[in-house]
Structures are given as structure tokens and as C-alpha cells.
Amino acid sequence: MKISKIIIYDEPTVPEIQINRIEKFLKDTFHTDVEVRRSFFENVNDEIFQKVASTRIFELKKPFSKHIPTELEIQIERKNTDNSQNEEKVLYDGFELQKTISKFIPTDEQNQNVLHIILTNKLTCTFDESDFRYHARALIGTNPSIISTTGIIEAPAKPKEYYLELMTDFSKEKTDEINKKYKGEFLEYNDPRLSEVLEGYILQAIMYYETGEAFCENKECRLYNAHWQKELLYSQLKNKKFCSKHEESFRKIINQS
Ligand SMILES: [Zn+2]
């Protein structure tokens, strides 16, 4: 394995993350050194908050252009409160955020054998040249890897019928009724299943860093790039296995030292 140590940064505003279970999962799976830290955004140079705020995006149909943040926006970053459930979500360019974070990793920890995995509530998005718009993303791979808990909830789509029913009536009452009807079929905020699903994304981050291969096209694989919540819950909670091809590359990785 190229990686000799994984440093994973928790997101303290998301209490569903069972960081100790995740740590154990990583140690048991990869038999490598794992260190858990409370948050990437604690004990870091104050400059970072201005830089992070400048990666905000406001227009979904335009490629990234650097935002000049207001004092209030910088203050919001400093506080790192969970705003993911607000109506007005703050969106960030995932690759720009990744670049920013990488600059704040101490030099002695910038080592290709040390993989940094940052869990965050920030909603990361990437601009897609094929349809010329931003899409929410749960995982921004490479080193550091960013995994967005809000992205896990927002990026894979809910059932089509859910949106159709909502289209007719947006009232709070109707929304609650529909949420009840489809309960369990997709991840919600404060969903206790989030932590286990996170393990799958962490696996994807590690495998991507080790092999350079992004995602899998096979729905029976934990590396599957789920477009629908239903697929996500199937591949990460029910099936929980690699396809035969990735089972083999996983074995190879853990047997190299
Ligand atoms: Zn696969």
C-alpha cells in the first residue's frame, strides 16, 4: 500500500458520524496507522477562513470565478456552524476548496504516504463541462480527500415520484407528508445510517488514491458511483461488497507493503 498513515478529520457539527467506529473500520480493513482529529478547521491559521469563503459559488450555470467574501461570510466560516439544513444552502467549488485546504496542511504532513481525509458539512459541487453546470458531489478525491456529509444527502437523487409529488404542492404540510411516505428510501439530515454510508465513501477515497481509478460502473460494488439514493443505500448498507474486479485490486493493495 502506498499509504502508510491515514489522518481523518471529523466534522463536529454532524453528531451522526461515529468517528470511533470509522477509525476501527479503517484499522481492521487496511491494517494501517490511523489518526483521528476533531476538525480540519480547528487550530489552523485564521487566513484559511477568508480563502474558504472565496470558494463559494453563486451561479450554477457559470464556471468558477473567485468570490471576494464579505466579513460576514468569513465570520460564518470561523464559526463553522451547521448551515447545511437551511433553505439557503452555501455551495462551494469542490476542487477550489480542495486546493485551499491542501495549502494549510503542515509541510511535514504533506507526504504522499499520508492520506488526509476531511469530513465536512460544506456542500461541495463540481462544474460539469458536458452540461455546463455545477452538480453537488459527495467526494472530492486525491490527497487531501474531501467527503461532504451534505453532499451524501443531496447529491444522489431521491425517487422520481418524490419530486413529482412535491411539484404539485410545496407547502410545509405536504412536504412533511411526502417525507413520511418515502421515509427510509433516502438519507435525511440526522439520519443514523449516515456513518455507515460514510465508510463506503472513505473506501472510495482510499481506493482512488491508491489506484487512480475513479468509481465503478457495477451496482454490486461498494465503489459504485450512486446517482440515486436507492442505489447508494443498496451498495453501502445492503450489499457492502466489492465487485470481483475491485475485490482483487483491494487484495493486491493490502498485500503490498
Ligand atoms: Zn467495482
PLM regions: where:
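N-terminal low-structure segments adjacent to metalloprotease catalytic domains
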Residues: 1-137, 250-257
